[in-house]
Regions:
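Metal-dependent nuclease catalytic cores that hydrolyze phosphodiester bonds in DNA/RNA
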Residues: 1-2, 336
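Short, conserved catalytic or adaptor-binding loops enriched in Gly and charged residues
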Residues: 28, 319-320
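Secondary-structure transition/capping motifs at alpha-helix termini
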Residues: 29-30, 119, 172, 346
Length: 346
């Protein structure tokens, strides 16, 4: 049935996230306003809520909310026997089961919205809509060339450090393995460094005791202290043996892939949005204060630009305003705490 979305509100349980992308990008639906019952539940039943009366929930999935707020019961998806199947492969019985499953979900979402809307501030509905549009109707333009250049630089720097370490450790061994396995030298070194067991063996080979710590899961057991946050591992990066220090620093680089991941995510996101980059945020995502929290590549927490150029600068510097607009940058120290103190007083 045709619907005039220009004067309608599209409400879904994950409409401020995945569902809105499907609706807008795959189905071409552009409603007058977006509503999200999951977002509303996060705000209304957060630990610090002051306008509802303080019921805290164990989660905001449709199943949990429907049960805890007594608006109905969600059906069992497993019973539809459709998991892992494409629609084209559904039997008639499976299509009928899925139709019933979806009808119940839709009915639960409608009941949930009617429950949550009571006492819910109208301006917060506007913020949920705004948050959703920052995702599905992005305005920031990405300078993809700048991001791609930074990504190449990061990968080349890692590769160079791994090759240098391979030479220091004995390139002949790795070269022989390369001929046998077809694996590149840098990939072999990467594997040696990424594995705690293999890195421990490397330390032993270099005459350095493997640092140990009490196992976080079993206090009676000791385990290698080789995580990037372990003080003993951090100390290895300034070891008197330069080979040990180099290996420790290279292991840290291998384990730290956040920058590469974010740069790649920027490129992928812009590729599917005609060169523009979505800003995915979770409304009321912070458990204590109820502020927005970062999603995906966390646009709320991009690395600062320091006095010396770094590849991570590309994350901020690649963001461009659309034609006719400017980006105004503002960053205040301790702003979350200060805003909450202000709200507490008023």
């Amino acid at each position: 049935q045709a619907m005039d979305w220009s004067d309608a509100m599209a409400i879904g349980h994950n409409m401020s996230g995945f569902d809105s992308m499907i609706l807008a990008w795959r189905l071409g639906v552009n409603p007058k306003m977006y509503g999200c019952t999951a977002a509303m539940a996060r705000a209304k039943y957060s630990k610090t809520t002051t306008y509802v009366g303080g019921k805290n929930l164990t989660g905001v999935s449709l199943k949990k909310l429907a049960a805890e707020l007594d608006v109905g019961a969600k059906l069992d998806l497993e019973a539809t026997n459709t998991k892992g199947k494409h629609l084209v492969n559904f039997s008639e019985d499976e299509i009928a089961a899925m139709e019933e499953y979806n009808k119940v979900d839709t009915d639960l979402c409608a009941r949930l919205f009617k429950h949550l809307i009571k006492g819910f501030p109208k301006q917060e509905l506007v913020l949920i809509d705004m948050t959703t549009r920052m995702l599905v109707d992005p305005q920031l333009v990405l300078d993809a060339a700048k991001v791609q250049l930074a990504l190449r630089q990061v990968k080349e720097e890692k590769r160079d450090s791994l090759i240098k370490l391979a030479h220091a450790l004995g390139i002949a061994t790795f070269a022989a393995n390369t001929l046998e396995t077809g694996t590149s030298v840098e990939e072999q070194v990467r594997t040696e460094l990424a594995s705690a067991a293999k890195f421990g063996a490397l330390l032993t080979q270099l005459g350095v005791p493997v640092p140990m710590k009490v196992s976080p899961t079993n206090p009676a057991k000791m385990t290698p202290a080789l995580a990037k946050t372990d003080e003993a591992f951090i100390a290895l990066q300034t070891h008197k043996n330069p080979l040990v220090a180099s290996a420790a620093m290279a292991r840290l680089e291998v384990k730290s892939t956040l920058l590469e991941t974010r740069l790649e995510a920027f490129i992928k996101a812009a590729n599917v949005c005609d060169g523009k980059i979505p800003v995915p945020l979770k409304y009321a995502g912070a458990d204590t204060t109820g502020r927005w929290s970062g999603e995906q590549y966390n646009m709320q927490n991009l690395p600062r630009i320091g006095p010396s150029p770094r590849p991570s600068d590309a994350l901020r510097m690649s963001l461009r305003a659309p034609e006719g607009y400017k980006i105004i940058v503002s960053d205040l120290s301790g702003i979350e705490l200060r805003v909450n103190m202000f709200l507490w007083k008023v």
